[in-house]
Amino acid sequence: MISYLNEIFYQIGSFMTDFEPTRWTWSHFRHHSNTSSVSDPHDFEAALFHQYPSLKSFLFSFVPFYELIYFKHSFKYEIIKHALGFTTPVMRDCIPQNEIAKCRLISRIHVLLWVASFALSFYLMNPLPALLIFFPRYWGNIINIFNMTQHLGLPEDVKDHRYTTRSVRFNPIFSFLYWHMEYHVEHHMFPSVPSYNLPKLSNLIKDQLPKANTSLFDAYKEIIPAIIKQHKDNTYFIKKSVPSI
């Protein structure tokens, strides 16, 4: 029953966040195997968080609808290609052959729901259906303020997740909204642990982990200077103090 409910909410959550769930299952498995590997083109976090952005481009990533400028590089565009029968590099390299048909089917369902939202908006002469179904990622991208804490400013191509990943302490409301993913080092070390158990896991292994940032503000106190330095020197990274095991 729990597995069944997990699958239902995974499908719903994936649609809400523009992830085709089959593709995301396998590409995210790759990410957890090779965290921040610049040699792996399908490590999403590496592609998103390790391109040494300027402070200007970093700040623009929080501006509503700004991501539409790069629609051809978005997950939505990839889903449309999968729905139309195109084989993308991530489909070829990450998704098992027996899962490809499932990926295409779910991609087509996503596209049909997007089209239906536009049709309903047109019929009602009201933008709300499209804004709530197709556009949330674009007007709600302020949520990136959480996501950006995961790996930004940290080293690449290091197998020890404690160096490449950051944990932050959030207030209870932020923690609930973020599904406890602020315990991100713990999540990478033990990806099969459910998110609601990450605080307990963190407490059990805290003597083996680098010190977590105490808040969003504390995290960005180290992230923003690192962005400025990395834009000028791409060999720079934040060095975390990691306990020996």
Q: Can you name each region flagged by the protein language model?
A:
Residues 1, 122, 167-169:
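Helix-boundary and loop/linker segments of multi-pass membrane transporters
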Residues 4-133, 195-245:
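Non-catalytic, topology-defining segments of multipass membrane proteins
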Residues 8-22, 136-140, 169-180:
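Membrane-embedded alpha-helical segments that form the functional core of polytopic membrane enzymes
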Residues 20, 69-76, 132-159:
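Transmembrane alpha-helical segments that form the membrane-embedded catalytic/substrate-channel core
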Residues 24-36, 146-153, 177-193:
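Histidine-centered catalytic micro-motifs
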Residues 42, 166, 188:
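Flexible, active-site-adjacent loop/turn segments at secondary-structure boundaries
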Residues 128-131, 158-168, 172:
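Short, motif-level signal for alpha-helix interfacial/capping segments enriched in acidic residues
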Residues 158, 194-195:
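Active-site-flanking alpha-helical
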